[in-house]
Amino acid sequence: MSDNQQPVVLGKLGSSHGIKGWLKITAYTDSVEGIFDYVPWLIKDQGVWREVKVTQWRFQGKAVVAELEGVTTREQAQMLTNCEIAILPEQMKELDDNDFYHRDLIGCEVTNVNGYNLGIVDQIVETGSNDVLLVKANAKDAFGKVERMIPFVTEQFIKQVDLQGKQIVVDWDPDF
């Protein structure tokens, strides 16, 4: 299965809440309640993805708790603690132009406008004002760089993103 076919992890199941099988939810979505916009969920239970349905959810203080279909006891809920919550890639919402999912940018080759290969996107760092590409430099980088941090600011630094070709072109000095 390729990376684009793998389930997309949106959160994880936390500890049990109460005696009726409810679970605390840790969501990686922009808003905590945004995870409930995706139906159905997949959970990775004992190494195998399986589909689950959320029957209801609510805020519980600062936490969010949910009831899953078929989970009716505290013991059943405890068996699911720390299971990842995911969806199929085709369930991902369509984005506007110049918006990208982090998972799609990771692994892209980054070159500058002069054709110099700066390396591969290893991760995305969220800074609050804008995301930053953490680019792992090639082993034989002519400038001796191990990694570069390039602000993901379209028009100013990011000139082109080709997700099909896994290429990003940037206006960036390789010595910086």
UniProtKB/Swiss-Prot annotation:
This is Ribosome maturation factor RimM. One of its GO terms (cellular component) is ribosome. It comes from the Bacteria. The PRC barrel domain binds ribosomal protein uS19. Gene3D superfamilies: PRC-barrel domain, RimM. NCBIfam families: 16S_RimM (TIGR02273). It is found in: Cytoplasm. Keywords: Chaperone, Cytoplasm, Ribosome biogenesis, rRNA processing. Binds ribosomal protein uS19. One of its GO terms (biological process) is rRNA processing. Residues 97-176 form the PRC barrel domain. An accessory protein needed during the final step in the assembly of 30S ribosomal subunit, possibly for assembly of the head region. Essential for efficient processing of 16S rRNA. May be needed both before and after RbfA during the maturation of 16S rRNA. It has affinity for free ribosomal 30S subunits but not for 70S ribosomes. HAMAP family: Ribosome_mat_RimM. One of its GO terms (molecular function) is ribosome binding. Belongs to the RimM family. SUPFAM superfamilies: PRC-barrel domain, Translation proteins.
